[in-house]
Regions:
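Conserved class I S-adenosyl-L-methionine
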Residues: 5-67, 80, 84, 101-104, 163-194, ...
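Class I SAM-dependent methyltransferase SAM/SAH-binding core
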Residues: 72-74, 78-123
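A short acidic, Gly/Pro-enriched loop at the edge of an enzyme's catalytic core
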Residues: 124-133
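A short SAM/SAH-binding and catalytic strip from SAM-dependent methyltransferases
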Residues: 132-146
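A short glycine-rich, Lys/Arg-flanked "PGG" loop and its adjoining helix->strand segment in the class I
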Residues: 147-162
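Acceptor-substrate binding/catalytic loop of class I
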Residues: 167, 171, 200-213
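Short alpha-helix
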Residues: 206-229
Length: 264
């Protein structure tokens, strides 16, 4: 999760508070219910520093020329990445576990858009070897076990197809938790719960963090070859008022890690 400094919470932004830290699989009730604040989150996502000027541009840059390519967006949310890919000529399909998010994506993309309510890590109602690319933007870190999700995404990709993804950076997560007074073991896979407040609504979200080698091992086990690992900067057109001080003075540690994987 990309945490902004305590002194940086622009209007419409998301404020966060670390609630708990655990290696247990069980989480609090109602956690990760994006449907409960879909509209508020989608509105913030449109213009926030983290999404509009950092993560989404980086994903589009890694995707590069997508004209004519069939792309599946896994965990599409309200569809901002899907729309950007379609505007670049891609033939797009998306799914999300939140029906509320899928409805917002349908309003954005139109009633004829290929959108599904489905959960990452469960079997998808899609045929084998269908897509040239799959994008997974900030979704894998909600899962304890990446194996089933990666295997299913590999199944729907054509041989040689690409999985383009972003996840929380394990180095940044470990540093944040240490600054919060916790004692995380870097080599462990563990989860933490944060309280998000956006537009006056407060929800609990749970994220799983794991070391870099656990990520790369999971990719290889699922039948992927790593072709790119990226830690991109923010875009140069970011409005200055959105830049946290630690970004402006170059003291910022990238909070997301990006990969391009090839289906082998």
């Amino acid at each position: 999760m990309c945490r902004m400094p305590n002194d940086h919470n622009p209007p419409g932004g998301i404020s966060t508070r670390l609630v708990s830290f655990s290696a247990d699989s069980a989480g609090p009730p109602g956690v990760n219910d994006y449907g409960s604040f879909a509209g508020a989150y989608a509105a913030s996502n449109e213009t926030s520093f983290v999404n509009a000027y950092y993560e989404r541009p980086a994903m589009l840059a890694l995707a590069a020329d997508v004209a004519g390519r069939r792309i599946l967006d896994a965990g599409c949310g309200s569809g901002p990445l899907l729309l950007a890919l379609r505007e670049r000529g891609a033939i797009v399909t998306g799914f999300d576990k939140s029906a509320g998010m899928v409805e917002l994506a349908r309003r954005r993309l139109g009633d004829d858009a290929g959108l599904l309510v489905a959960e990452l890590g469960s079997p998808l109602p899609l045929p084998d070897d269908t897509f040239d690319d799959v994008t997974a933007s900030l979704v894998l870190h909600y899962l304890e076990d990446w194996g089933p999700a990666l295997a299913e995404l590999r199944r729907v990709l054509k041989p040689g197809g690409r999985l383009i993804l972003s996840v929380d950076h394990p180095f940044a997560e470990n540093l944040w938790h240490r600054e919060a007074g916790l004692k995380p073991e870097y080599s462990a896979t563990y989860n933490y719960v944060v309280e998000w407040t956006v537009d006056g609504q407060t929800v609990l979200l749970r994220f799983w963090t794991r070391p870099l080698h656990a990520m790369t091992d999971a990719f290889t086990a699922a039948g992927f070859r790593i072709t790119v690992i990226s830690e991109p900067p923010v875009t140069p057109d970011t409005p200055r008022e959105l830049l946290p001080l630690n970004v402006a003075d170059r003291q910022w540690i990238p909070c997301f890690l990006f990969f391009v994987l090839e289906a082998v």
